[in-house]
Structure formats: C-alpha cells, structure tokens
Regions:
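Well-ordered mid-protein domain cores that form the structural environment of catalytic cofactors
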Residues: 692-743
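Conserved, structured C-terminal
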Residues: 612, 616, 620-621, 634, ...
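Short beta-strand segments
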Residues: 26-28, 276-278, 403-407, 712, ...
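Residues forming anionic-ligand binding surfaces in small-molecule and nucleic-acid pockets
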Residues: 197, 289, 540, 650-666, ...
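Residues forming the flavin
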Residues: 2-610, 761
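A short, contiguous, amphipathic alpha-helix enriched in charged residues
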Residues: 38-48, 676-693, 774, 778-783
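Acidic, proline/glycine-enriched N-terminal capping motif
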Residues: 565, 573-704, 709
C-alpha cells in the first residue's frame, strides 16, 4: 500500500509498526503515531468531507482540535462515534471511518446540487423561503430534517464504560506545550502539588511541529528532560490525552481523559473516558493559540490548509501535503512553513500582503530560494476536488488591485495571524481585551486565582514565553504556600526578530464579496463573508444575533477558526472597531464531550425511584402501555389485538359508558390527617368550609397558593371526628404535603394536628360505569350499595374480597363509580377478584388516556393541564366552592385588581365546526376576524388546554381558557395551526356529556 506523500524520514511516528485502516470503504495504511488526518494525507487523500449547507468538497485544514472539515463517523454499532475530528483520532489497527453529510457517497453526493442553488440559500434563507404556502411546512420540515446534521446518532447502546474522579491540587496547568511545561516545572520544583493536563498523546505542543532549539539542542530534548523530571516528582500528575473543557467557580476545572480511544476496538478494556473534577488553589492556562485562516475566494477547497498545520504534518508525521505550494500570509511565522516545505523539496511561492518585512524568517526564506511576492494577495483559488491554482493580485493600503498572475499549485498554506485560546479564561469570568498590535483578543484581568501564559497570553515568541511561564509557575506555587530554594534557570533560546503583522480580514472589497466566488469565514457551516455583510444590511448589529442568523460559530468547532475574522468583517460593515463589536460568549464545552463522560456508570434508571402500584405486574402481564406520571408508572392504555392508542381508548371509553371499567388509581396522593385541629387546618387550606362535614362523607376541595391561584384539588373524606384522609393529584402529592408541613411548622406550630403520607399504604381501584354497583356487590356483602344507604360523596368501611376496605362513592367520569381502597399488600388479590366479578359484564381495565377523555367529556379539570399557575377558582367557573364567610389561604389575593378584573382567561369548552378534527393541545385561540401577520404580533384570546376525540359523542371536544370566555358562549373563534390552516370552533360549556349529571345517580 503506497503512502505516496509520506516523507522518507522524519516525523514522530513508528515506521516499524504499520497500521491498516478503512476510510469510506477503501483500505489504506499508516503508522503508529499517525492521526487519521495525517494518514489520509500520507496516502494522498485530501477530499475527505462535504460542507454542511452547500455540500462543497472539503479537505483537512488544521492538525488540531479546531478542525472544521474533516469530521467523520468513527466505527460502527455500539462503538460508533459521530462527528469525530480526523485530526484528533489516533490511528489504530482496523480503524473504520466514513465521511458524514454525504449521500450516497462522498464523490456522488446528491445534495451537491445545493452548490448550484447557493444564491438562493444565503444567511437566514430558511426564515424567508419556507413561509408560504403555510400548509406546505410539514413537507418542508421533513426535507430540512433529512438534510440537517452531520454524523448519525448511535442506534444501539454504547458498549464502553465511563468513570468519574475528583482531585485537588495546588497548581493546575492546562496545556503541555513549552509554556505549560515551564510553568509546571517551576511550580513542582517549589514543592507544590501539580496536575498537568494536555490533550495530546505526548507533551511538547508547538515544539513538536518546528525546528526550534533550546539550550543549543533540539527543542524536543528539552521537552523530554522536563517531562522526565516532572514524572520523578511524587506530587506531580500528568494527564495526557486529556482536555480541560470547562472552568467553573472557585477554580473548579472539568477534564475528560481518553483512556482507550487510541486502541483497536477489540482490545479495549476498562474505562473509555474518565471525567476529572479538579479543584485547584491556582490555575495556569497555557492553552496556546489558533492560527487564523484568510478569507479569500474558494478558500475552502481541499488542499487549502493552515500554514502551521502544514509544518505539523511535516515535522510530526513525516507527511508532505503538497509539492507545489503557495504560502499566503500577513505575518512572518508562515515563512517557517515555506522553509519547511522547501527543505522537503517542494516548490514554494510566498504571497505576502505586506509591502515588506525585515524579519529573520523572510530573509532566510529568500536565501533558500523561496520566491516571495510582497504586496500581493491570493484573491481566489481554483480546482474541483483539490486546489490546482490561485489568482494573485496586488495589494496596497488595504486595497486589492488588479490581477498579477495565476500560480499553479496543489497546496495553499495560509496564515492570517493567531488568536489566543481564551475559552477557559472567559469561562472563569475573565473578559478578553483587544490588542491592535497583535491583532487579537488577549486575556484581561483574572477574576479567579488564575494566570495565562505563553501564546494564550499573546506571547508568541518562545524565549519570552518561557521566561514568563517560569515566573508564573513560581508565583502560583508561592501563592499556594510553597517557595523554591532556587527558581529553575530560564533556558537559552535565540531571539528571533519578527516583522509586524498586518491585519487582513477580507481579501477584496465588501461590495465585491457577494459577486465573486464564496469567501468562507466559517468552513463547517458554510458561512461566507457575504452572509455576514447581508446580516449587517438587514439590521443585525449584535455579534450574538449575527451568529445565530448566519450560524457562524455553530457546529463542532464552535468558531475556533473563523469567529475573529467574522467579527472583524462585521465591525467593518458597521463602521465600528473590533472591541466595540465584541466577541460571542465562550461557553463550555471547549470541545465536544461524549454524553457517556457525564453519565459515568449511571446509564440505567435514574436514582429518583420509579414507583409502581401493587398491581403493576398484572398490568405488565396484560400488555399495558405505560406513561410516567410524577415518579409513577401508570397504565396509559391496554391495547388488544394490535390496537393503536386511539382504537384502544375508544374501546375503553365506550366500555365505561355502556357497562363497566376499572382503573388503577393507587397513585393518587393520600395524606392522613389527625388531631383536634384537623378541621381548622382544612378550613385554612381549602376554599370551601369543612366544619359541618359528617363522618362518612367526602368533599371536593380546591387549594390555592398565596396569589389566589389554583394549586391542587382533590377529595377529602372524614373517617372520624378528628381523622381525615386527603387525596391529591398524582404529581402534586409531595408538593401538597410539603405545603401543609410548611404552614404547620412556620405559621401554625401550635396547631394540634399530625400529617402522614399513606399513598403507598393503599391500593385504590375505581370501578366505573352503569354496571359498577353490580360488580362491587359481588365481592362485598357487608355494605349496602343502594342509593339511599350509600349516597354520592359518601364513604363506608367494609370487606372486599376478604380484605378490609374503605369504599368511597365518588366519580371522575360522571358515571356511577366506587373507589375501593384496600391495604397495598392485598391489592392484586382484590383487583383480580373485581375483574372476576365483572367478567359477566365484560369489565374493561382502562388507563390514564381514557380517564382523561372521560373527565373532559364532563368538564372536570386537571390541575397543571387546565391550569397553569395563573388560574383562579372564578376563572374555572367554580366560584361555588369559594366560601365567603371564612378565611383561607389565597383569599385576599382573589380581591386584587388583577385577579378580579374583567376579561381574564376563563375555562370553557370548544366544539370545532369540523367534528372530526382534534385540536392540538396548546394551540392559540384568536378572534374570528383576526388575521395572522408574519411581522406584527397577533392578539391572542387564549389557548387549548385539553383536546380529545369523544367516542360516546362521536366528535372532537376541547377545553380551553379564553379571555372573557364565560360571556362568549356560542361565539365562534379561530385556532390557527402551524401549517397555515385556520380551524373554526364555537365556545361552549365545558360539560359536553350528561349535562344534568344524572348518570352518577343511576339506580
């Protein structure tokens, strides 16, 4: 297998260990020490990806975490990793990777047609293009979602294991480059406990990618010496292959350490990734800097790379990315890349936007025979699958002149300056400050116990960076309580004279940007200079708004390469300075972190307990589909013979209305209330009076918060003179108990009353329907179930199927119903006895969905669905349960001007003109003659709170809250839908079925 672009010697790879890998179905070879990116380049593979929006051919741009293009799907099945950067993937035997965002293949991507449609797809096109006709939006959405995204999410469970650990140290150094090593060495030799974090497999940082000398020896020897000394010290921990991705308060830094990603899948054992939470007395950020690309025409072609990345591939991996190179720069650093290429036998031409430079590197390049074109810029690159030539024009005083010539080439190495990596500094609370001389943002005053060193602090010269890093390390150790007897001696590094950088944010004029070839700022998201200029013309002035409008800085690289260029172009368009324009927010995570890292080993059910009723297993055995209600697993519906939700609910509803059904209501909250002041407490908590409630009777109550808004509801039964049992909503049980305890403990500590949650003590079954009395009579002989002996809203003690029971005659469906409460350990036996007793009536177990339909047919509310914390009892039309002669919590708030004003949203029913159309819950309601505007706010009357199809009524029904709704009975309103359709409905009473309430009193 030929690696045609692999140099014969050099690089930090092990040529004795060849490795075979597969990319897009083709087999290639690399060496141990390669990354996937370097191995692909060694094999002459430059076209590796398609861009996000236009699906343009893309190649490898960088050699580090900032890579925007070479994003791949790594491995398959349980080990697959989407959106992995090829520049960070260490090569291993048998590695399998595929390009993302290309269908069916990279070369024959069907979405490549977007390149021809690009003029119709500028920034924000999706806000403008798919607005009409509105009923086509579902079709648009389907296609947009099909085209969106990069990699594919895993479809099977992750096979790897993840762990967490915690550490404390005196000094945490982030970055294992020259400055990080120097700072860690100074702190460690002073006796401080040091943790050094670096994201590479080996320490050295930028020194691995250049020919620098330290102490008159190759810089790598100095790296090896310092690393060896650090590893000998007992209080030093070195975390390689580790990324510090978050900096929180009080010097808490989160780090993910990759332990097995560099190994073949078949050989991985133990933990894949380890999440470190490190608390440090002092933090030193030696995070380096990102080289900036230059914004010129077709700068996204494969073969257009950063100059520093080219040097990295040469020195670190022994790869020559091109043999006929154009180095395009505005600074001296790129001349080192020109020298590196020349030393490898490549033909090199430097295009320098500056008129001249008196630096040492340009002089050295000229001595080596490198052609230098000063006062010139690359205006555009050409090529199909790889760059083949560039156009060069003159450049002077910030203006691009006429075309000078075309240069054939197979590589463009660009360098537009350097941007310190400020992400962690900004996350710590620090603010970045613009430096005109260095044309970059630098860290400002530290907010936490932190210092930035090296390129992260804008110190791009090696000699000065090392000296300052040693000082920072010693100062950090001293601040942590350690003072070295002798500071490490600063190594000797030859000072290099550098010419001044000349900022170059955009080649060509802003006016010409929309007309020429695309000049990309953000490679991954296809954000061109013209998009930013368009956003500015359309009124977007905040850089945060421009980011969201254009998608600049989105994606896996989060703007590491392009954001500074984009901010500068925006600043020019707005006539502002870059500091005035500002930066976008540096949010964690610095690089993508796997979900597994955060989850650790806790990949199963949450610690929050799953609550199951006493008959849960019966439900499972009989095929129930479940939904989560609070912490409870409740049967949602019981499908038979392949029924879907709608068919099952229709059958269950009709069974209850025409015969008998049974519901497991054990999840309802139950609070046992006992004591001489029990009635007093209930009077305070509920809006209605409780003094005269007889033993053996039940009463419905509404509970309000201090603002007079409905907080919870339920039925409370009086078991004895000083003994009550309160029921609450399933999801509100804990909240209500806490509410009661809060008032008892803080405001009424002298009340003689005790509360106990007994929800789990009782199994509760609602036997519902016109045949329900006949069912319960068969299993309970010691209770007279006649209407006179056992009236509605009453309670009786008895024995049901051999178990002591509390039976209540209450109904949440409007049908004759009995609620049977038995000790939980007898629950299944009693349930099965009830099922057997009801067999002759075809008794039907039903779930929460049917319960919702039945109660909606009767207009009964569900707190939290038909209320939202802004609804009073009067809004619900339930003023009848609000006492006028007693006080209760929230009463005073009911008389406030806002809660008693006209035009509040009130609880009503809705009947659609199209009887078969079920309104979406949450849909907004507008007046019939109101037109929806795409630009102006539309006045809303209210919204739909509950909506179902009623099998007994054979039509749709809905509950809603509408402004002044109780005075608008019979009026028509409109519900506009997302697809543009307008549904007309009439406001009605919320009681749709059995409006006289006779069915719950059936003989």
């Amino acid at each position: 297998m030929s690696q045609k672009d692999r140099l014969g010697t050099g690089g930090r790879i092990n040529r004795a260990i060849p490795l075979t890998f597969t990319f897009n179905g083709r087999t290639y070879q690399g060496f141990q020490g390669d990354t996937l990116a370097s191995a692909l380049l060694a094999n002459g593979v430059h076209f590796v990806a398609r861009s996000f929006k236009y699906h343009r051919p893309r190649g490898i741009v960088t050699a580090d975490v900032a890579e925007p293009n070479a994003v791949v799907q790594l491995e398959t099945g349980p080990y697959t990793v989407p959106n992995a950067r090829a520049t960070e993937i260490e090569l291993y035997q048998g590695l399998v990777a595929t390009s993302v965002n290309a269908e069916p293949s990279l070369e024959n991507d069907k979405y490549a047609i977007n390149q021809k449609l690009s003029r119709f797809m500028p920034a924000g096109f999706y806000y403008k293009t798919f607005m009409w006709p509105r009923n086509m939006w579902p079709k648009y959405e389907e296609k947009i979602r099909e085209a969106a995204g990069l990699g594919k999410a895993p479809e099977v469970l992750d096979a790897d294991r993840y762990d967490k650990c915690y550490a404390h140290c005196d000094v945490l150094v982030v970055g294992g480059g020259p400055s990080g090593l120097a700072a860690a060495h100074a702190a460690a030799t002073a006796g401080a406990r040091v943790i050094l974090v670096d994201d590479q497999r080996e320490l050295g940082g930028s020194l691995l990618s250049c020919r620098a000398e330290i102490d008159a020896k190759p810089a790598q020897q100095w790296v090896e010496k310092i690393e060896a000394e650090l590893r000998k010290l007992p209080d030093v921990t070195i975390l390689s292959r580790s990324t510090a991705f978050g900096y929180q308060d009080h010097n808490l830094v989160t780090v993910t350490q990759r332990l097995t990603d560099h190994q073949p899948v078949s050989m991985r054992k133990g933990t894949r990734e380890l999440l470190w939470k490190i608390r440090a007395k002092r933090v030193i950020l030696a995070t380096g800097a990102h080289e900036r690309p230059i914004v010129f025409g077709n700068n996204d072609l494969p073969g257009v790379m950063l100059a520093g990345a080219v040097s990295t591939y040469i020195h670190r991996f022994g790869v020559l990315p091109g043999r006929n190179a154009v180095v395009f720069t505005n600074n001296d650093r790129a001349y080192q890349t020109a020298l590196d290429l020349k030393a490898c036998g490549a033909k090199v031409t430097v295009v320098d936007s500056r008129a001249s430079s008196n630096g040492a590197l340009p002089a050295a390049a000229k001595r080596q025979g490198v052609t230098v074109m000063s006062g010139a810029v690359v205006t555009a690159a050409s090529g199909k699958w790889r760059v083949s030539s560039v156009d060069v024009a003159s450049y002077s005083n910030g203006k691009t002149g006429g075309k000078m010539q075309s240069l054939p080439c197979d590589l463009v190495a660009m360098s537009g300056g350097f941007s310190p990596v400020l992400h962690l500094f900004a996350q710590s609370g620090g603010k970045a400050c613009w430096n005109d001389e260095k044309a970059c943002f630098l860290p400002g005053k530290p907010v936490q116990a932190e210092a930035s060193v090296g390129a992260a602090a804008g110190e791009f010269g090696l000699a000065r960076a090392l000296r300052l890093a040693l000082d920072a390390g010693a100062e950090a150790a001293k601040a942590a309580g350690y003072t070295a007897a002798q500071r490490p001696v600063a190594p000797q590094v030859a000072e290099t004279v550098e010419g001044a950088l000349q900022p170059l944010w955009l080649v060509g004029s802003r006016e010409a940007a929309p007309r020429g070839p695309k000049q990309f700022v953000d490679f991954q998201n296809d954000v061109a200079a013209a998009d930013i200029l368009l956003a500015a013309r359309e009124g977007f002035e905040s850089v945060e708004h421009v980011k969201r409008y254009t998608a600049m800085g989105f994606g896996t690289d989060q703007g590491k390469l392009g954001n500074i260029n984009g901010m500068a172009i925006l600043a020019q368009a707005l006539g502002k300075t870059i500091p005035e324009t500002g930066t976008t927010t540096f949010r964690p995570n610095y690089t993508p972190v796997s979900f597994g890292t955060f989850a650790g080993r806790e990949t199963g059910d949450f610690l929050d307990p799953i609550r199951k009723t006493a008959v849960h297993e019966w439900h499972v055995e009989h095929g129930a589909m479940f939904e989560d209600v609070g912490n409870w697993k409740r049967p949602w519906y019981f499908p038979k013979n392949g029924e879907d939700l709608h068919a099952a609910v229709k059958r269950e509803c009709l069974a209850v209305r025409n015969s008998v059904g049974i519901l497991d209501a054990s999840t309802l909250g139950k609070i046992d209330i006992q004591g001489p002041d029990a009635v007093k407490l209930l009077n305070w908590m509920y809006t209605n009076p409780w003094n005269k409630l007889e033993v053996g009777k039940c009463r419905y109550g509404l509970m309000l918060d201090e603002n007079g808004m409905v907080f919870d509801d339920g039925v409370t039964v009086r078991l004895a003179d000083q003994h009550f049992m309160m029921t609450t909503t399933t999801g509100g049980a804990a909240r209500v108990l806490t509410w009661l305890e809060r008032w008892l403990q803080t405001e009424w500590p002298d009340m003689k009353v005790r509360l106990a949650s007994v929800t789990d003590h009782w199994a509760t079954f609602a036997v519902v329907g016109p045949k329900s009395r006949k069912v319960v009579q068969k299993v309970c002989q010691d209770i007279d179930f006649g209407n006179e002996a056992f009236p509605f809203m009453s309670y009786r003690n008895g024995t049901v199927a051999g178990a002591k029971a509390r039976v209540m005659r209450i109904s949440f469906s409007g049908e004759l119903a009995y609620e049977v409460n038995v000790p939980a350990n007898a629950g299944r036996a009693v349930w099965e006895a009830l099922m057997a007793a009801g067999a002759e009536f075809d008794i039907t177990p039903y779930g929460t969905e049917t319960m919702h339909v039945l109660r909606a047919e009767k207009g009964y509310i569900i707190v939290g669905q038909d209320t939202d914390g802004s609804i009073t009892p009067f809004d619900l039309g339930m003023g009848g349960v609000v006492a006028k002669s007693k006080d209760f919590l929230g009463k005073r708030s009911l008389s406030r001007s806002d809660t008693s004003k006209e035009g509040r949203k009130q609880f009503v029913g809705l009947l659609t003109d199209d009887e078969q159309f079920v309104l979406p819950e949450g849909a907004q309601i507008i007046a019939k003659d109101t037109q929806v505007s795409a630009t102006d706010p539309t006045p809303m009357l209210g919204h739909v709170t509950s909506s179902y199809y009623s099998p007994i009524l054979k039509r749709s029904i809905a509950l809603a809250v509408v402004k002044g709704g109780l005075n608008k009975m019979g009026e028509s309103v409109v519900i506009p839908l997302a697809n543009g359709r307008r549904i007309t409905a009439k406001i009605s009473s919320p009681v749709f079925y059995d409006t006289e309430g006779v069915r719950q009193h059936v003989e």
